């Protein structure tokens, strides 16, 4: 009897749970770590890519994409392709009909509603991904949202999804400072430090994107990321030196 609750997305279990939705959330927890930081004048998204084969083109492994003037990172299954296509069409349709770009909350709500529909229909399964969505509204204000497989969404100053998301959230709660992320440099440093806390493949498979108001998405190349890594390493050494001096 219990298997019916496992298999059907439209049937609640006796304790009031939708098990298929919970399984989708478990798929997210097994995905690559993705982090987002809302800075004073930018939104930074970073992901840890899984190790690629030596002969595989690195550019084909992407966890960060652009939806019109909005940037999205995701963790979980390749279900993201469907959401990306639907969201891009919605962004273009809105721009043609209203002659204005979508707001961040509008496109986030659209993605969340699409996810929620898939938790109420037979013959479908929930989307096994969690999305971090960042960008700017027309007034120049930066925003960072996250959507879950169940269809809920929240706004954050900084957050993470994927495997080890809990560890990264705890890191953000301790390390996030408004004054430090007020600059692009500070926001990027915090995002990279968060990824390094849980990176399973070290520092070699990090992907970082910066969205600034009115500018195209900027993907940091390997050289720039290495420069940030050197700065972070030096700061760690300085902190250790200060602690030794206090003792």
Curated annotation (Swiss-Prot):
Q: Does the keyword Nucleus apply?
A: yes
CDD domains attached here?
proteasome_alpha_type_7
Write out the GO cellular component annotations: cytoplasm; nucleus; proteasome core complex, alpha-subunit complex
- InterPro entries in the cross-refs: Ntn_hydrolases_N, Proteasome_alpha, Proteasome_alpha-type, Proteasome_asu_N, Proteasome_sua/b
One GO term (biological process): ubiquitin-dependent protein catabolic process
Report the sequence similarity comment from the record.
Belongs to the peptidase T1A family.
User: What is the protein named?
Assistant: Proteasome subunit alpha type-7-1
Organism, scientific name: Drosophila virilis (Fruit fly)
Gene name of the encoded protein: Pros28.1
């Amino acid at each position: 009897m219990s298997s019916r609750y496992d298999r059907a997305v439209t049937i609640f279990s006796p304790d009031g749970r939708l098990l298929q939705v919970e399984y989708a959330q478990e798929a997210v927890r097994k995905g690559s770590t993705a982090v987002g930081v809302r800075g004073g004048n930018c939104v930074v998204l970073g992901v840890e890519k899984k190790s690629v084969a030596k002969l595989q083109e690195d550019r084909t492994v992407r966890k960060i994409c652009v939806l019109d003037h909005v940037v999205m990172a995701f963790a979980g299954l390749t279900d993201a392709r469907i959401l990306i296509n639907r969201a891009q069409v919605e962004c273009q349709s809105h721009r043609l009909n209203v002659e204005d770009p979508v707001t961040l909350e509008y496109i986030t709500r659209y993605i969340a509603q699409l996810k929620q529909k898939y938790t109420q229909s037979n013959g479908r399964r929930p989307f096994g991904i969690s999305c971090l969505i960042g960008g700017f509204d027309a007034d120049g204000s930066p925003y960072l949202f996250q959507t879950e497989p169940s269809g809920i969404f929240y706004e954050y100053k900084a957050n993470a999804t994927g495997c080890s998301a809990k560890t990264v959230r705890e890191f953000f709660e301790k390390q996030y400072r408004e004054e430090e992320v007020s600059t692009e440099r500070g926001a990027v440093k915090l995002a990279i430090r968060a990824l390094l806390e849980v990176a399973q493949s070290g520092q070699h498979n990090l992907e970082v994107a910066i969205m600034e108001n009115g500018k195209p998405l900027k993907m940091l190349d390997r050289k720039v990321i290495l420069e940030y890594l050197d700065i972070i390493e030096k700061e760690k050494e300085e902190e250790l030196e200060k602690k030794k001096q206090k003792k």
